[in-house]
């Protein structure tokens, strides 16, 4: 076993080449305390609900993704932010969309000689308002029964862009692209349920 927790570059948040780069060793507490644009509110809400404070202080965003649990709290938020992940090895670097990285319950594209080094979020996705809701049997120290992360951009009262992701409802968290396509162009003042059902 190799402890990589002391590698500072894995625990930083920076802007590089049009992406916000979140080091895979960034803890949930780090994320909660980081100054980030408004669209990261859902990720901060998520951070405050991962396990206990002790877990938030040592548990990392990269660990949450590599664990590939269907109930991994960070995945729906990162899917809604259109995240990619950076994998490094002695052979070089590769970047995958998050939705291509997690293949199933506890199953990822991570090779034996790779580590997940960073989560990359395009700055063009850093617009809009967000929210994260988690349903569990109790309020704290709970494994999710269901969760949803949503990012919405409005032009007046018209939905110009929306990203909705759910977790704990299947083996892999998913973006609800069909629902998103139905909602884009609709007014928030109308009965959206009529359009959905």
Q: Residue ranges of each PLM-predicted region?
A:
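C-terminal structural segment of proteins
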Residues: 1-197
């Amino acid at each position: 076993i190799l402890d990589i927790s002391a590698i500072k570059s894995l625990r930083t948040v920076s802007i590089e080449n049009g992406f916000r780069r979140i080091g895979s060793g960034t803890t949930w507490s780090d994320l909660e305390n980081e100054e980030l644009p408004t669209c990261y509110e859902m990720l901060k809400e998520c951070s405050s609900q991962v396990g206990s404070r002790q877990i938030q202080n040592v548990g990392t965003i990269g660990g949450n993704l590599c664990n590939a649990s269907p109930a991994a709290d960070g995945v729906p938020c990162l899917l809604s932010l259109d995240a990619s992940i950076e994998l490094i090895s002695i052979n070089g670097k590769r970047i995958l969309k998050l939705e291509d990285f997690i293949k199933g319950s506890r199953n990822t594209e991570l090779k034996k000689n790779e580590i997940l080094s960073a989560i990359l979020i395009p700055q063009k996705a850093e617009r809009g308002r967000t929210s994260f809701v988690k349903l569990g049997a109790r309020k704290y120290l709970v494994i999710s029964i269901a969760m949803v992360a949503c990012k919405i951009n409005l032009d007046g009262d018209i939905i110009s862009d929306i990203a909705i992701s759910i977790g704990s409802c299947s083996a892999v968290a998913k973006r609800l692209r069909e629902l998103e396509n139905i909602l884009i162009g609709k007014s928030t003042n109308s009965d959206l349920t009529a359009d959905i059902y």
